[in-house]
Design a protein with these regions (language model features):
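Glycine-rich phosphate-binding loop of ATP-dependent small-molecule kinases
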Residues: 1-214
Length: 214
């Protein structure tokens, strides 16, 4: 089963990805992880990517495709995979389709987890972490027993810079701008499933299982 996971920041992507790969016994292919692995291992592809990153430039689509398809050629992907962070552009999606078609394969389902902007802002800006032990809380979903104080060690809870309103709004805007053309592309292909991401983590996963089958 070849899957793509589209999920905005704050919508529980990590949790759903972990549940999907465990249930369906397929590898989780995260673009970020592949890039880091190639760079760490000093591969030719990693060196090329590092040059662009060092220069503060975006890694070109062609190189992203090369790095992703190199990973998809590994043996553990022969019975399926869950793609996360790839494709990011229509060009990448088209190249992925060509790559899979050449192997007599295709993308079976694109899981689009949808959460409205207001809910995402609450989720992202409500996160608090302990300044000492790193324990994680949320002012709405997992509040500490005492406001602003860590349940674990009693230290002060802080809001990370990444979780402030401006950064959160920017992350959501970038995701929406990047993902809309992809959603349109897969709508035309007829292989996308839209999932309401506001129903709770377990309900979202049960919906995914209902779509993919047991």
């Amino acid at each position: 089963m070849n899957l793509i996971l589209l999920c905005p920041p704050g919508a529980g992507k990590g949790t759903q990805a972990a549940k999907i790969i465990e249930k369906y016994n397929i590898p989780h292919i995260s673009t970020g992880d592949i890039f880091r692995e190639n760079i760490k291992n000093g591969t030719e592809l990693g060196k090329k990517a590092q040059e662009y990153m060092n220069a503060g430039k975006l890694v070109p689509d062609e190189l992203v495709v090369e790095i992703a398809t190199d990973r998809l050629n590994k043996d553990d992907c022969k019975d399926g995979f869950l793609l996360d962070g790839f494709p990011r552009t229509v060009f990448q999606a088209e190249e992925l389709d060509k790559f899979l078609a050449a192997k007599g394969s295709k993308i079976d389902n694109v899981l689009d987890i949808d959460v409205n902007r207001e809910e995402l802002m609450i989720r992202l800006t409500g996160r608090r972490v302990c300044s000492k032990c790193g324990a994680s809380f949320h002012v709405v979903n997992i509040p500490p027993k005492q406001e602003g104080i860590c349940d674990v060690c009693g230290a002060e809870l802080i809001q990370r810079k990444d979780d402030n309103e401006e950064t959160a709004a920017n992350r959501i805007e970038v995701y929406n701008k990047e993902t809309k053309p992809l959603i349109d592309y897969y709508e035309k292909a007829g292989n996308i499933s839209h999932i309401d991401g506001t129903t709770g983590l377990e309900n979202v996963f049960n919906t995914i299982v209902g779509i993919l089958g047991e």
